[in-house]
Amino acid sequence: YFDGRIISLIPESLEIISNEILGEIISKKANILAGPTLGADPIIGGVLMKAQENSIQLQGAIVRKAAKEHGTGKQIEGLIQSSDKVLIVDDTCTTGKSVLMAAKATEKHGCSVVGIICVVDRDEGGRQEIEKSGYKFSSLLKVYNRKLIPWV
């Protein structure tokens, strides 16, 4: 079992992840990095810091499975607007359900999703589900025969 949250909580690996994802943001011209809470939270924070260091305009957003029943009642936390171009991120991709939920929630908000990226593709059908739903998918690492293969 690969716990993607662990590597995103180690500063050295989070820096590598953040640099790679920032490159994707630049190439896809996204202005929002969003993802499902909890796996995406540290990644979004790391990428936002890298963007700030490089004078790149970028905002973050966290997507809940469902809207809160109290407080603001929001499903998406962050300064997100209907004209935004969003890159969805998560630590791992197994079935694709969590990133698809986040993508659909941001589209419901009026945004366009320019792609989905995960740190690790577990190669358990998630990529296929995401692409079948019409999204472009990439990952930094892929599990192949129970081994991690870099930079897919």
Q: Where do the PLM segments sit?
A:
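Active-site-facing substrate-recognition patch
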Residues: Y1-K29
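Short helix-loop-beta connector
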Residues: I26-N31, Q81-D84
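Short acidic, glycine/proline-enriched helix-loop-strand junctions
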Residues: K28, P42-L58, Q128-N145
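Short glycine-rich phosphate-binding loop at a beta-alpha junction
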Residues: K28-G39, I117
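Short, glycine/charge-rich flexible loops or terminal/linker lids adjacent to PRPP-binding catalytic cores
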Residues: I43-L87, T94-M101
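Short Gly/Pro-enriched loop/turn and capping motifs at secondary-structure junctions
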Residues: K68, C93-T95, V119-G125
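PRPP-dependent phosphoribosyltransferase catalytic core
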Residues: K104-V152
